Amino acid sequence: MSEQGKLILFSGPSGVGKDTLLDILIRKNPNFQKSISITTRERREGEVDGVDYYFITPDDFEAMLDCGEVLEFAKYGKNLYGTPKKPVDKWLAEGKSVILKIEVQGAAKIKKMYPDALAIFIMPPSMEILEHRLRRRGTENEDDLVRRLSIARDEIEKSRDYDYIVINDSLEAAADEVLNILSKE
């Protein structure tokens, strides 16, 4: 029987580079498994079902909630986002390290269910750099950008509840720091 895997909670403000960091980590360590969230939102151009998210209907989402198949969920605007329970438990039982890219409220819920989970907060070098990254991404209008930056400030406030804080000033350096943290845990 294989040793139980490690659950890693990966949070940080929108635009901090979580997805890119996750891709680097998984490339560097094939034992890492990225959990894919479910969502009721429309698929964006270039997104692939089962790779970026599992895109499901609101009725299917509600059915999964009713059956206890969702570890945690949150509503953003009109859309629901959640973490499916079955694949996470399967990968942990197989000895894989499972990384959940998750917002701070969800991380707090998961930490209560899985107290041994390791929580890592990805921090921008500064709010100015974060704003620049979000503007460069070009996916938000000005109102959305202001809202995201306000949410980012709130999330950064809660970063003290995490086991580790990693500043993403350089993707490779941040990835190496996360790998170093995980090798010690």
Predicted regions and their residues:
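Hydrophobic anchor at the beta1->P-loop junction of P-loop NTPases
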Residues: 10
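P-loop (Walker A) phosphate-binding loop of NTP-binding proteins
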Residues: 13
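ATP-binding Walker
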Residues: 16
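Walker A/P-loop
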Residues: 19
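Post-Walker A helix-loop "phosphate-sensing" segment adjacent to the P-loop in P-loop NTPases
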Residues: 26-35
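ATP-dependent small-molecule kinase phosphotransfer cores
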Residues: 37-98, 104-105
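Conserved phosphate-donor/acceptor-positioning beta-strand/loop module used by diverse small-molecule
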Residues: 98-103, 112-137
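NTP-dependent small-molecule kinase module
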Residues: 116, 136-140, 154-185
